[in-house]
């Protein structure tokens, strides 16, 4: 699938239905909350250094759930605190908020929440010193230019950059067949060529991402990137890649039951890559526009991940993966297998967790644009 197809067909499940991202993104929120102190400290330091009259903030890969506007609220409050401490006699800066995701994202779900967002903002400020906040959507891939030069002070990308711009071209042979048969991503059955293809695509994409943001950001601007990663050089571990291995096994289980065809499993390839810390740091150094201020590895405490009653970790993961992958799975396999697929997946995650822990790793990366 090329970049244009990916931009058109990949999106989180919209609305607020049972399988929507809005109702099934609490695992992502927990990771973002774990990193929140780093994010807000970075924004506070940026404001202290630059003190702009108008502050441009971009949320890249914003999706459409409640996490989006709650994150923006945190940003505004953080700047207000820094402002009143540093320059209390000056008026508050204006906030230009740029929400970005692929065109299929349910931006309307966010827009419908904006009236309540502004009401709460006024209430939190006692209808007094309330900042001017301008929010706009910018659909498109962040693996390309999105904004005019020198307009963005702070970039936030949470759970976005482990999604590649496309499935690596090197994953296919001369006949256009996947060389990663039986796996939807890197797994224990994958060859070295598969790992190299994904790694190469990540490096190419991440370099383009950095180059584009360097054009759009002001000098000394900051980026906070929250990325699913892996702990060491091995591409296969019981971390983030293992969740996709279990999805492969779940689909294979349906193949064995005659629910879908083996060819469909063999031809379903995801555009996901969990980088190592060395790979992230290496591309930052190589591209050269940013200084790496901070790179921390977080292991987010496992959580039931839902407020709808007691559910297992496997169920929480299954709900999250479905909300993230449903658009692509429906395109490839059809809708009728999804309930059975994720029932199987839920069971497999819980069974594996009972045998041995699964340790998904999250990186928090803070970058400062060089002067």
Swiss-Prot record:
- Cofactor(s) of this protein: Mg(2+)
Enumerate the Gene3D superfamilies for this protein. Answer: Methyltransferase, alpha-helical capping domain, Vaccinia Virus protein VP39
Q: What InterPro entries does this protein's entry cite?
A: MeTrfase_7 (IPR005299), MeTrfase_capping (IPR042086), SAM-dependent_MTases_sf (IPR029063)
- Bound how, and how many: what does the cofactor note say? Binds 1 Mg(2+) ion per subunit.
Q: Do the record's keywords include Endoplasmic reticulum?
A: no
Name the residues that bind Mg(2+).
180, 266, 268-269
Which GO terms fall under molecular function for this chain's record?
A: metal ion binding; S-adenosylmethionine-dependent methyltransferase activity
Positions with a binding annotation for S-adenosyl-L-homocysteine: 21, 62, 67, 101-102, 141-142
Name the positions where (11R)-carlactonoate binds.
Answer: 28, 162-163
Listed EC numbers: 2.1.1.-
Its activity depends on temperature as follows: Optimum temperature is 20 degrees Celsius.
Activity versus pH, per record: Optimum pH is 7.
Q: What class of enzyme is it?
A: transferase
UniProt keyword annotations, A-Z: Magnesium, Metal-binding, Methyltransferase, S-adenosyl-L-methionine, Transferase
User: Which reaction does this chain catalyze?
Assistant: (11R)-carlactonoate + S-adenosyl-L-methionine = (11R)-methyl carlactonoate + S-adenosyl-L-homocysteine
Q: Name one GO biological process term.
A: methylation
Tell me, in a sentence or two, what this protein's role is. Answer: Methyltransferase involved in the biosynthesis of strigolactone natural products, bioactive compounds promoting plant fitness and soil microbe interactions, but preventing shoot branching. Catalyzes the biosynthesis of (11R)-methyl carlactonoate (MeCLA) from (11R)-carlactonoate (CLA), downstream of MAX1; MeCLA is probably biologically active as a hormone regulating shoot branching and serves as a precursor of non-canonical strigolactones (SLs).
The UniProt subunit note reads as follows: Homodimer.
The family line of this record is: Belongs to the methyltransferase superfamily. Type-7 methyltransferase family. SABATH subfamily.
What name goes with this protein?
Answer: Carlactonoate CLA methyltransferase
Q: Which organism is it from?
A: Arabidopsis thaliana
Its gene name is CLAMT
């Amino acid at each position: 699938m090329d970049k244009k197809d990916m931009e058109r067909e990949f999106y989180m499940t919209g609305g607020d239905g049972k399988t929507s991202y809005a109702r099934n993104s609490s695992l992502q929120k927990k990771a973002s909350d774990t990193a929140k102190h780093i994010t807000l400290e970075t924004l506070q330091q940026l404001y202290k250094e630059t003190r702009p009259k108008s502050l441009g903030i971009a949320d890249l890969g914003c999706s459409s759930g409640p996490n989006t506007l709650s994150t923006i609220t945190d940003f505004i409050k953080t700047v207000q605190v820094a402002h009143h401490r540093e320059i209390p006699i000056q008026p508050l800066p204006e906030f230009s908020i740029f929400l970005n995701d692929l065109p299929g994202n349910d931006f309307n779900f966010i827009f419908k929440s904006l009236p309540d967002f502004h009401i709460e903002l006024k209430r939190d400020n006692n209808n007094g010193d309330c900042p001017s906040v301008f929010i706009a959507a910018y659909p498109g891939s962040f693996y390309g230019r999105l904004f005019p030069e020198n307009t963005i002070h702070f970039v936030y990308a949470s759970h976005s950059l482990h999604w590649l711009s496309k499935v690596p071209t090197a994953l296919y042979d001369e006949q256009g067949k996947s060389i990663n048969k039986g796996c939807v991503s890197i797994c224990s059955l994958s060859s070295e060529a598969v790992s190299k293809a994904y790694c190469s695509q990540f490096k190419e994409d991440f370099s383009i991402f950095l180059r584009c943001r360097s054009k759009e950001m002001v000098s000394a601007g900051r980026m906070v990137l929250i990325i699913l990663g892996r702990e060491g050089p091995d591409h296969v571990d019981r971390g983030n890649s293992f969740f996709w291995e279990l999805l492969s096994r779940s689909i294979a289980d349906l193949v064995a039951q005659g629910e879908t065809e083996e060819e469909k499993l063999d031809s379903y390839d995801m555009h996901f890559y969990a980088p190592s810390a060395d790979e992230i740091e290496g591309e930052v150094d190589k591209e050269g526009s940013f200084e790496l201020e901070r790179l921390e590895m977080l292991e987010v405490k496992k959580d039931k991940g839902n407020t709808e009653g007691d559910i297992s970790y496997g169920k929480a993961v299954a709900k999250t993966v479905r909300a993230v992958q449903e658009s692509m799975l429906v395109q490839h396999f059809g809708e009728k297998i999804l309930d059975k697929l994720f029932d199987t997946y839920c069971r497999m995650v819980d069974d594996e967790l009972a045998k041995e822990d699964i340790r998904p790793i999250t990186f928090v990366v803070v970058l400062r644009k060089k002067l």
